[in-house]
Amino acid sequence: MKKHLLTLTLSSILAIPVVSHAEFKGGFADIGVHYLDWTSRTTEKSSTKSHKDDFGYLEFEGGANFSWGEMYGFFDWENFYNGRHNKPGSEQRYTFKNTNRIYLGDTGFNLYLHAYGTYGSANRVNFHDDMFLYGIGYNFTGSGWWFKPFFAKRYTDQTYYTGDNGYVAGWVAGYNFMLGSEKFTLTNWNEYEFDRDATYAAGNGGKEGLNGAVALWWNATSHITTGIQYRYADDKLGEDFYQDAIIYSIKFNF
């Protein structure tokens, strides 16, 4: 763990001279209310292990573009209306994600840094799952669209396993379009994990896994966005089968 934290720290230090001369290009921030509805098959098959029950959550989300690169992050408060130590699946949980792309000049390539964590304490038994990615990315962008793939090494710090944990190849993508006078955005994030450590793989469906979501957003006004997402995961999230859900969302944009 120390080696990987040192790598991330050095990367941040090297970026400081660039950040100190950064020009802010734009950004966004929002607060949203979301409800994740797992398919009945997913809930039934996960009832003895990962307990995937439907849940609502509050999310704070934001991103910013600079001359040196870009940042994105969110913080989710899941089952905020329940107790911290409720039974598994209905307990409060806390999840965050942060991604950074540090541009490598004008090449289109970027240094990709990614941190993710989720935490809970069902029945007063603490659980955590942290993931750190460091690798290389590339930005493809055009008028109203973007496709940003990455390839990264992964380190996991989890309740049941800590150590190097293979690789992740993935992307974020989006497309803005109009239907009549209404503004819409179609987005997708996707992560393919492979060459996982054998210990981790034993509890997560094997050496490979898939995780992601496809979303359609209606930008109703400058301050209100609603959306519907199809959430999917295969050999991931503590299970060895395909899991899916629909997420209903409404966000207030600052």
Curated annotation (Swiss-Prot):
SUPFAM superfamilies, alphabetized: Tsx-like channel (SSF111364)
Transmembrane segments: none
Gene Ontology, cellular component aspect: cell outer membrane
Top-rank taxon, per record: Bacteria
Any Pfam family: Channel_Tsx
Record family assignment: Belongs to the nucleoside-specific channel-forming outer membrane porin (Tsx) (TC 1.B.10) family.
Protein name, entry field: Uncharacterized protein YfeN
Organism whose genome encodes this protein: Escherichia coli (strain K12)
Organism lineage string: Bacteria, Pseudomonadati, Pseudomonadota, Gammaproteobacteria, Enterobacterales
